[in-house]
């Protein structure tokens, strides 16, 4: 049997997600238990959203949790480069191979033509997918368009009838009708590969034997199986893990739960407790004990113990487990050491001090001015907003609209946050000063604070959004009747 090789392949397009850490953990545990290797690959084909800063945050966050990898962009390895953007034109070569073999085709439709196609399908109650119109072009017509420099994508061919059989380690046999599968774009008009082509090519070239990923990829499995068949390659074993869920059983999302690993790091959770909790997501130790280390998980790991019921990511349960780790594993000396590392982290502290120093006269003043930087959720009440110069409904609506705008913000920097909030105040016809005042209360607990936009940038997106969410709830968010009206008003802004 060949060496077991698993991988995690995050996209560096935002904060490191707990879902990424969850899948990485199970990939690493499986590989280590089987005496194999765990690989990290960066899927940065989305050049408009991928950033080096996000990549660094992902690597740092996974390392903070105690995860490490045998090969990756930072440690190298025999099958690199481990960033897709650095792998040159290999994807174009493989896409061309599929064209030459008759398994893929050029498609020349404009965005407008594709939109019109989908709208017509929607009106007729048909599945919205590519209808294969470019397959009707003759070889001469295709060549003429290529010679004329008409922009194109390369799509894969899909069988018109029959069923794809997917074998899954946890779920057994899954059958998916080919009629449900789209003729996937493999190479985009800019020459960059889509996830589906790059993922299959890289997994093959990096000798990945087991693909352990979230169950949201089940419907994509037929495309991947077909690509392996088209290339004549051995298919890795598939394993689709259950998705993490909110306590209300909905898919884990930042609107209902903090999803960034950085949030839990900044909130003062122990990395051992967070990885322990992620290990309990759908899996259990043979003796059913709740508290265990990463090494203990790997020692006893059996992927068949994964339960397919949606595991609930409950922050209260995580806090309880973290408390157990603190009480059972830390002496006063080690607690003091970890607390100082967290609270007086030089990198974090140096961001705060330039805001604090102009506002203090003694060291003892620092706690009053900067205490909110070292807290989780603030104990604010409705009375804390009593000095705000806005009508109650306007205040409630302004805070809800601000939260929605912040949830949609992809670049979390001071100037971006300020510009978004200022623009929102203008379209809502509220003076910026009056609009910003409740933001101060939500973020710092008082209207007399250091710059709220500096504070939000330093605290990070998840803590800032969570505090805003708390403020919206304290003020009384929209009722069911108001919610639809507010959403329409917000969409019309």
From Swiss-Prot:
Q: What is its main location?
A: cytoplasm
Q: Which Gene3D superfamilies match?
A: 1.10.10.350, HUPs
Q: Which UniProt keywords apply?
A: Aminoacyl-tRNA synthetase, ATP-binding, Cytoplasm, Ligase, Nucleotide-binding, Protein biosynthesis
- InterPro entries, from UniProt? aa-tRNA-synth_I_cd-bd (IPR045462), aa-tRNA-synth_I_codon-bd_sub2 (IPR020751), aa-tRNA-synth_I_CS (IPR001412), aa_tRNA-synth_I_cd-bd_sf (IPR008925), Glu-tRNA-ligase_bac/mito (IPR004527), Glu/Gln-tRNA-synth (IPR000924), Glu/Gln-tRNA-synth_Ib_cat-dom (IPR020058), GluQ/Sye (IPR049940)
* Motif ('HIGH' region) on chain: 10-20
Its biological purpose? Catalyzes the attachment of glutamate to tRNA(Glu) in a two-step reaction: glutamate is first activated by ATP to form Glu-AMP and then transferred to the acceptor end of tRNA(Glu).
Describe the subunit structure: Monomer.
Report the family membership.
Belongs to the class-I aminoacyl-tRNA synthetase family. Glutamate--tRNA ligase type 1 subfamily.
The protein here is known as Glutamate--tRNA ligase
Origin species = Marinomonas sp. (strain MWYL1)
Q: Which gene encodes it?
A: gltX
């Amino acid at each position: 049997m060949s060496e077991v090789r698993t991988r995690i392949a995050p996209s560096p397009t935002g904060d490191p997600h707990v879902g990424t850490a969850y899948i990485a953990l199970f990939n690493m545990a499986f590989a280590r238990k089987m005496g194999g290797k765990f690989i990290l690959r960066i899927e940065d084909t989305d050049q408009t959203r991928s950033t080096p800063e996000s990549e660094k945050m992902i690597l740092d966050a996974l390392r903070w949790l105690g995860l490490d990898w045998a090969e990756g962009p930072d440690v190298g390895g025999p099958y690199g480069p481990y960033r897709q953007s650095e792998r040159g034109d290999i994807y174009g070569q493989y896409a061309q191979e599929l064209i030459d073999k008759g398994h893929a085709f050029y498609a020349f439709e404009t965005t407008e033509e594709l939109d019109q196609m989908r709208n017509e399908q929607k009106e007729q109650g048909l599945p919205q997918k590519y209808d294969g119109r470019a397959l009707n072009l003759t070889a001469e017509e295709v060549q003429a368009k290529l010679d004329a420099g008409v922009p194109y994508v390369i799509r894969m061919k899909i069988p018109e009838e029959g069923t794809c059989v997917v074998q899954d380690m946890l779920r057994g046999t899954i059958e998916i009708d080919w009629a449900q599968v789209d003729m996937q774009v493999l190479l985009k008009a800019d020459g960059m590969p889509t996830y589906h082509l790059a993922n299959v090519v890289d997994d093959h070239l990096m000798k990945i034997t087991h693909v352990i990923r979230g169950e949201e990829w089940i419907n994509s499995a037929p495309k991947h199986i077909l690509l392996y068949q088209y290339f004549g390659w051995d298919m890795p074993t598939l394993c689709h893990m259950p998705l993490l869920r909110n306590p209300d059983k909905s898919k884990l999302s930042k609107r209902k739960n903090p999803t960034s690993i950085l949030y839990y790091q900044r909130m003062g959770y122990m990395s051992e407790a967070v990885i322990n909790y992620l290990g309990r997501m759908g899996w259990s130790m043979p003796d059913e004990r709740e508290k265990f280390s990463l090494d203990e998980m790997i020692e006893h790991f059996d992927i068949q113990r994964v339960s397919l019921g949606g595991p609930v990511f409950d922050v209260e349960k995580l806090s309880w487990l973290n408390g157990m780790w603190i009480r059972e594993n830390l002496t006063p000396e080690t607690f003091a050491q970890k607390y100082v590392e967290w609270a007086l982290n030089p990198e974090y502290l140096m961001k705060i001090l330039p805001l604090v120093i102009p506002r203090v006269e003694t060291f003892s003043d620092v706690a009053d001015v900067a205490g909110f930087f070292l807290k989780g959720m603030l104990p604010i009440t409705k009375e804390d907003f009593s000095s705000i110069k806005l009508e109650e409904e306007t205040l409630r609506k302004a805070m809800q609209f601000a939260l929605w705008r912040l949830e949609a913000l992809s670049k979390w920097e001071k100037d971006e946050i300020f510009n978004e909030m200022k623009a929102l105040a203008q379209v809502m016809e509220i003076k910026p000063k009056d609009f910003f005042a409740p933001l101060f209360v939500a973020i710092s607990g008082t209207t007399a604070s250091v710059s709220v936009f500096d504070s939000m940038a330093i605290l990070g997106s998840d803590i800032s959004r969570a505090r805003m969410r708390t403020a919206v709830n304290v003020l009384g968010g929209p009722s069911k009747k108001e919610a639809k009206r507010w959403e329409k008003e917000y969409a019309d802004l």
